[in-house]
């Protein structure tokens, strides 16, 4: 199993970054990893937050915020959910499964926006919460 936390960001024009053109809208780095590691179970996770929050969900809003994951294998996604809950204080009900690995396009796509918010707020210690 591979947990993909990467983002295809282009900083060549400074901040905020843009997505590398080949990974915008119709393809993702998550899909590229799955393509090259065809036998692996790739789960895209943790790529929309700062590193400190990846390993301690309680640092923001007492862990009441969402984490997005996606991948082609349901068992692998469940394993990642359990790993995150058991080791990094993520609440299972706050981990939102978006579907198969093509949804990495969406999570990678919001990262330039995340960087803009981080710049405006002056901190990377924030996350998204889907309110229903």
Regions found by a protein language model. Name each.
Residues 1, 40-41, 65, 93:
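A structural micro-motif
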Residues 3-59:
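Rossmann-fold NAD(P)-binding glycine/threonine-rich loop
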Residues 53, 62-132:
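Active-site-lining helix/loop region of Rossmann-like oxidoreductase modules
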């Amino acid at each position: 199993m591979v947990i993909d936390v990467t983002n295809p960001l282009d900083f060549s024009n400074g901040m905020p970054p843009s997505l590398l053109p080949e990974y915008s809208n119709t393809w993702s780095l998550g899909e590229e990893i799955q393509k090259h590691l065809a036998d692996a179970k790739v789960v895209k996770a943790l790529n929309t937050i700062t590193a400190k929050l990846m390993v301690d969900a309680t640092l923001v809003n007492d862990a009441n915020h969402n984490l997005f994951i996606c991948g082609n294998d349901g068992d692998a996604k469940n394993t990642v959910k359990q790993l995150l809950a058991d080791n990094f204080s993520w609440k299972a009900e706050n981990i939102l499964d978006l579907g198969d690995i093509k949804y990495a396009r969406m999570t990678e796509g919001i990262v330039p926006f995340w960087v803009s918010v981080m710049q405006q707020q002056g901190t990377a210690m924030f996350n998204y919460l889907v309110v229903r």
